[in-house]
């Protein structure tokens, strides 16, 4: 059973009673009559052939309260898009697949590129951005959840607990972030959150002093969780990063746009496992190494927008402070693991901390050397201002793809 402690300045909604998914779904069915609910699934084609997504779709097919499911499909040929249409066709809910590599959406992307408004990098951020645009264009839902497609431990209760806070009309939340314990196969996972993000936030607070943004970020129990839910109006104004800083960037945007009492986090799963990234000790352009650099730069950029001045000496101090805090965390997690009968390899943990410490300096150098770097994709409000018919064009492209290849 979870505790009921409220840490930080963001409301935490706990799983206190293991309430049945049927009871949650019964309420969500009633909420959906007045506030239609949707789901965004950003996916790579390769995930359709894995273990996680087929099982996930079987669960989603049984969800009674969804009015729309939007699937963003990346890295797919024409034949693979056709396969995807059949793969998702047994979903009883209204659904559409965005073929991001198809000629129609590529043509729209090129139009936006000429206006300087297209996402500059391929990846999850770009995929999510176009899915958000489609939700705005289709105008079928008032609240929408988003989660990854590689969750090996998925069940319907995860989605129900994720979307409930923005579905309940008696709640005033605009945004909800999921959290869970990353424990699987007898060990504690979640290295980047445990060994980079939390100790780095503590180091920044120690180095820079009291800061509302850092207090806000440190309130989230699992800041890198890929599971969110939003009210529809959030999608108009949000600017999201196109790199690995997506999860941090979304939280930063929520901090910028909304007061703390409109935001919450929800305990959505007792167990959670997904595909794991390599540490990439010798390649800072891949795996957890690149992820750590992108995340760290996202934090530095946000702090700079608030007036924090960075220089090489500052980054050295942050790195040294981080290193000591992170090493202390390893001992804490080791003791937690031992008491719970779990494994935790201290040597591997310290190698990760050493890599992350180096990458804090790399992120700082990159931040200083590239002051004009703008990884954020423009908000849909800005895109509509520049191209007023963009949402209609997006909707038409997706519907024409669907009609051409599925014949419906």
Where are these regions (language model features)?
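Terminal low-complexity segments of carbohydrate-biosynthetic enzymes
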Residues: 1-17, 92, 278-408
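N-proximal low-complexity "stem/linker" segments adjacent to membrane-targeting elements
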Residues: 1-62
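Active-site-proximal specificity loops/subdomain of glycosyltransferases
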Residues: 17-20, 80-140
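Short beta-strand-to-loop acidic/aromatic patch adjacent to the donor-nucleotide binding site
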Residues: 138-152
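Conserved donor-nucleotide/metal-binding helix-loop-beta segment in metal-dependent transferases, i.e.
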Residues: 152-182
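A recurrent flexible, glycine/aromatic-enriched loop bordering the glycosyltransferase active site
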Residues: 185-194, 208-227
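Catalytic donor-sugar/metal-binding loop of nucleotide-sugar-dependent glycosyltransferases
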Residues: 242, 252-271
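Active-site donor/metal-binding and catalytic loop motifs
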Residues: 264-285
